């Protein structure tokens, strides 16, 4: 997922750099995850990796643009995320160099659970992804990484 969200990066190289940086005596490192539609299904793997490597994880939620926020998540995706993340214990750092408040997993899951799926926002999200991928001919399409994001069968409460 890292290579998709941060086009041009290499996850294996980044892993080695982060772990090496964290192990140096004079430095502290926080990993910051911002929950958004394109990456939400990779959160569980990131949280697990941070836990395995004893790295604190700060979190936020995208609200703007709205098509990357929780209201663009299909209902079955919300359920998948809730199921995978319910038991995660994540060390949320409070040392944010940001104006935005970090949130814990419980609050993030609550925000996702309370959100109402909006088909128009989901359509905007898909148009954004199409635009994003159009300038990156060698990128693996998001539909191949997370095809379930594109499955809209049996959505309840469509707006």
Outline where the language-model segments fall:
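A short acidic, helix-capping loop that chelates divalent metal ions and anchors anionic groups
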Residues: 1-5, 67-69
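Conserved C-terminal portion of the radical SAM core fold
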Residues: 10-158
């Amino acid at each position: 997922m890292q290579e998709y969200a941060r086009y041009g990066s290499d996850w294996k190289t980044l892993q080695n750099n982060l772990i090496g940086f964290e192990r140096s005596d004079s430095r502290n490192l926080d990993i910051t995850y911002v929950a958004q539609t394109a990456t939400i299904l990779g959160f569980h793997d990131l949280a697990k990796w941070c836990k395995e490597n004893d790295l604190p994880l700060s979190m936020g939620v995208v609200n703007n643009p709205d098509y990357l926020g929780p209201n663009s998540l299909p209902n079955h995706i919300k359920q998948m995320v809730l199921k995978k993340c319910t038991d995660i214990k994540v060390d949320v750092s409070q040392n944010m160099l940001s104006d935005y408040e970090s949130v814990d997993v419980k609050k993030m899951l609550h925000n996702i659970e309370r959100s109402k799926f909006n088909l128009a926002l989901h359509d905007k999200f898909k148009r954004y992804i199409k635009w994003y991928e159009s300038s990156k001919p060698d990128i693996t399409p998001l539909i191949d990484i997370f095809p379930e994001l594109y499955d809209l069968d049996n959505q309840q409460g469509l707006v």
